[in-house]
Amino acid sequence: MHNIFKGLITALITPFKDNKLDLYALERIVKHQIKHEVDAVLIAGSTGESSSLSFEEYKLLLQTSVEIVNKCIPIISGCSSNNTTYARALAAESTKIGVDGFMASPPSYVKPTQHGIYKHFEALHEVCNLPIMLYSAPTRSGVDFSDETILRLSKLPRILALKDCGVDLERPLRIRATVKKDFNILTGNDEVVLAFNAQGGVGWTSVASNIVPNICKELLEKWNKNDTKGALEIHQKLLPLYTALFVESNPIPIKYAAHYLGLCENEIRPPLTEASDSAKKQIENIITSLSIKI
């Protein structure tokens, strides 16, 4: 099975207008990614406010994204839930709609054991024929995969990757030493992309690339061509942007940045709130200093 989980994957925001999906803005957002040749887009992940979507909205978001992309780049859907039955329904619907793969985190809030985490993903693996990326986000889910559970899950034939949002930079080395050769490890933290890939990572699921996919793509291309100096120069330039985009809970800052650049409304669903005035100012200043335009 082809492994689509590599390179630059943009964790897309979900645009809303009047508390409904804004499909016109979605088209602008997705086409911006296609234009700059990202390697894939992730729909309905944490950055996409997936927990706020109804099942019907989830289906519409995926269906519309598939139509817009029209097979130009892979689409990865988010299928995270603390309810295994519901997560299976998301995975089954993703398969039916025609996405290229999906990502899921361990069930949040309920704090399953490692055996429970394994059984959850085994159930997702059984319900579809799509490639799967594990999503390690312990600050969000409250639990994480142990290295041993990652190894066990990697032996299931369609579990092909791990997106790691942790800060343990030894982890990719440890995992790489035990898993099958075609199992990919990617970072979900913009600010550590180079350090993570130096330790065995092969890609990056990025929030910043919602607004600077061209720069993020250039950074990764330089890194992959062993132009370490060039990659570091770009990374250094982007560090203030990474900081600004996490000055408040993701996706609050990136939603405002996208709005400021004309991609979508600055509408975010409760319990998240709009960016504070100080956060807005910080975001505006860095966008201006980097001359970011859409």
From Swiss-Prot:
PROSITE patterns: DHDPS_1, DHDPS_2. One of its GO terms (cellular component) is cytoplasm. CDD domains: DHDPS (cd00950). Keywords: Amino-acid biosynthesis, Cytoplasm, Diaminopimelate biosynthesis, Lyase, Lysine biosynthesis, Schiff base. GO terms for biological process: diaminopimelate biosynthetic process; glyoxylate catabolic process; lysine biosynthetic process via diaminopimelate. It holds the Pfam family DHDPS. The record marks 46, 109 as: Part of a proton relay during catalysis. Its EC number is 4.3.3.7. Pathway: Amino-acid biosynthesis; L-lysine biosynthesis via DAP pathway; (S)-tetrahydrodipicolinate from L-aspartate: step 3/4. It comes from the Bacteria. The active site is at residues 135, 163. Pyruvate binds at residues 47, 205. Its main location: cytoplasm. InterPro entries: Aldolase_TIM (IPR013785), DapA (IPR005263), DapA-like (IPR002220), Schiff_base-form_aldolases_AS (IPR020625), Schiff_base-form_aldolases_CS (IPR020624). It is found in: Cytoplasm. Homotetramer; dimer of dimers. PANTHER family: 4-HYDROXY-2-OXOGLUTARATE ALDOLASE, MITOCHONDRIAL (PTHR12128:SF66), DIHYDRODIPICOLINATE SYNTHASE (PTHR12128). Catalyzes the condensation of (S)-aspartate-beta-semialdehyde [(S)-ASA] and pyruvate to 4-hydroxy-tetrahydrodipicolinate (HTPA). HAMAP family: DapA. Belongs to the DapA family. This is 4-hydroxy-tetrahydrodipicolinate synthase. It comes from Rickettsia africae (strain ESF-5).
